[in-house]
Structures are given as structure tokens and as C-alpha cells.
């Protein structure tokens, strides 16, 4: 006689990479998914960007490059969802770098004494 073992449900409610449901299925688990409309997709990408940036912020050593690659992947998807090419986004970044500078000088602003 076989005993019934109920599945444990774990909620994620987040955007995942395209192959994640397949990978979950290969473990014998069942992923319940849906395809987002454009507005929900953009919102989910913005949430994913925050998630990946937080993971990158907490990463150390050899983990950091992989986390930065995740941030890059989300940025590319977000640019595409906004109707921009990666080249257009890089051009915007270059323009801003020209106007405001980069982060190469390692300048950390502690405070400003404002003239009244």
C-alpha cells in the first residue's frame, strides 16, 4: 500500500529566468507559472533589478561577478521591455558620464555646507 505524501507549496511570486520552470520540473517538482502582460512584466523587472542589486551588494569574492551578471541580464531585459536597444542604453550612460562624470575617482560625498 502506497502512502500519500502531499506536496509542500513554496510561494515565490517573482520573475524568473526562462528555463527555471524546466529545471524545477527536472527535479520532480511542479512549477505553477503565468505569462505577464507588458506592464506587469516591466514592474516585475524593476522588482527583479532591486532583488539582484541587493544580492550583488551582499556578495563577496568569487560570488560577486555572477551576481553582477544577473544585474546585467535584468538591465538588458528592462531596456528591451522599454523599447530600447542595449546600444541606446549605453549611449545614455555615456552621455550622463560626459555630463556628470563616472565613478572612477572614488569620490565619497560626506556632506555639503550650503551657502544661505
Report residues per predicted region.
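Flexible "arm" and connector segments at domain edges
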Residues: 2-116
Amino acid at each position: 500500500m502506497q502512502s500519500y505524501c502531499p506536496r509542500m507549496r513554496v510561494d515565490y511570486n517573482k520573475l524568473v529566468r526562462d528555463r527555471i520552470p524546466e529545471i524545477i520540473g527536472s527535479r520532480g517538482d511542479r512549477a505553477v507559472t503565468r505569462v505577464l502582460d507588458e506592464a506587469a512584466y516591466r514592474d516585475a523587472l524593476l522588482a527583479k533589478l532591486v532583488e539582484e542589486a541587493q544580492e550583488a551588494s551582499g556578495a563577496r569574492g568569487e560570488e560577486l561577478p555572477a551576481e553582477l551578471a544577473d544585474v546585467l541580464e535584468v538591465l538588458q531585459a528592462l531596456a528591451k521591455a522599454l523599447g530600447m536597444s542595449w546600444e541606446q542604453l549605453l549611449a545614455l550612460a555615456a552621455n550622463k558620464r560626459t555630463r556628470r562624470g563616472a565613478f572612477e575617482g572614488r569620490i565619497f560625498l560626506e556632506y555639503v555646507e550650503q551657502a544661505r
